[in-house]
Each structure stands twice: as C-alpha cells, then as structure tokens.
Amino acid sequence: MNDYINGFLYKIDDKFLYLELNYLGYRYLYLKSDLKNFKLNENNKVYIAINVIDNHFKYYGFFNQLVRDLFEILININTIGEKTAFLILENYSYQELIDIFKNGKTDKILQLKGIGNYTARLIINSVQKELFNNKISEKKNKVITSLEKLGYKTKDIYKIIINVDEDLTIDELTKYVLEKLSYINN
C-alpha cells in the first residue's frame, strides 16, 4: 500500500489533484481545506488513502498524514462514506476533531448538515475506540439512550459515563450518571 507520493503537481480542478511522477500521471480526490497548502507547478508530498467500493478504487490525497489517518478511520465506520468523512474534516481542524472525539462532543458533530444523533454517536464511539481505546459497552449504551430520551444532552452524558466503572449494574450506572448530571445542570 502507498503511504505518500512526492510528485509534480501540474493541475488542480474542483475535485482532483493531478500529479506526475516518473512519467506517470496520478489523480486524487482532495479536501478543499488542503488546497491552500498545495503548490501548483511544484513537487508536493501527498499522503494517499484508498477506498474500494464495489470493486471500484477511489484515491484520496491529503496534505497531512494525521488527517489522512483520521479519514481512513471515518470511512471504515458503517454508514459513513466519503462525503460524510469529508464534511467532518472540512469543518474542523485536526486538533479540534481530536478534542471533539476525546471529550465526546456529539453536539459539534450534530451541527454538521445531514448528521443525526445516531450517526454522531456512532462516529464518536468508533473514533474513540480506534484512537483512545475507549469502548462504550452495551450497558452504557442503554443508559445513554435512556437518559437522552429523558432530555439530557448526549455530550454531558458521555463526559460522565466514559470513565465510570463497568462493574456497576444498569440501575447503579443510571443513578450515578443522573447524580452527576444534576451538578452539571445546576
């Protein structure tokens, strides 16, 4: 698998970067936010991601390796495709995204057009699992869903529940989180 290409950037259109290396031309989809970093008619280092959908290869070029790695995590989440991954990466910097994922700020993801509560939670859970080894158990998911139905904010619930002991029963977990939520809301 290719990590990056260091090639001559001879053309940029509204969808693709076009690079030449050793008399071969390469075409990569790119983030609009990366455009300011690429230098036309110069050699550029472009980090590569490949996504295969129904035997069709799509190639993506990124200016930053960490952003590329985050993109690869996002497109491997069920129901999250290229457009949603690009939407997330276009609207927040890498550091902002790490903060959002680390602290479970679903409200920030929900601000993006077309992303609902379920998808935002799925994204946060998946990225936390991948980057920070945080796993939300089925038990914790039940408590989160119940408290959301009662009107509590998902981000507040996550801040509390992420560090709670797994040995608690659902009732004990719910009681503990409700108690902590009462301090946040007062």
From Swiss-Prot:
UniProt keyword Cell inner membrane present: no
One GO CC annotation: cytoplasm
Chain segments carrying region Domain III: 137-186
Region (Domain II): 64-137
Subunit description: Homotetramer. Forms an RuvA(8)-RuvB(12)-Holliday junction (HJ) complex. HJ DNA is sandwiched between 2 RuvA tetramers; dsDNA enters through RuvA and exits via RuvB. An RuvB hexamer assembles on each DNA strand where it exits the tetramer. Each RuvB hexamer is contacted by two RuvA subunits (via domain III) on 2 adjacent RuvB subunits; this complex drives branch migration. In the full resolvosome a probable DNA-RuvA(4)-RuvB(12)-RuvC(2) complex forms which resolves the HJ.
Role noted for this protein: The RuvA-RuvB-RuvC complex processes Holliday junction (HJ) DNA during genetic recombination and DNA repair, while the RuvA-RuvB complex plays an important role in the rescue of blocked DNA replication forks via replication fork reversal (RFR). RuvA specifically binds to HJ cruciform DNA, conferring on it an open structure. The RuvB hexamer acts as an ATP-dependent pump, pulling dsDNA into and through the RuvAB complex. HJ branch migration allows RuvC to scan DNA until it finds its consensus sequence, where it cleaves and resolves the cruciform DNA.
Protein family per UniProt: Belongs to the RuvA family.
UniProt-recorded name of the protein: Holliday junction branch migration complex subunit RuvA
Record organism: Mycoplasma capricolum subsp. capricolum (strain California kid / ATCC 27343 / NCTC 10154)
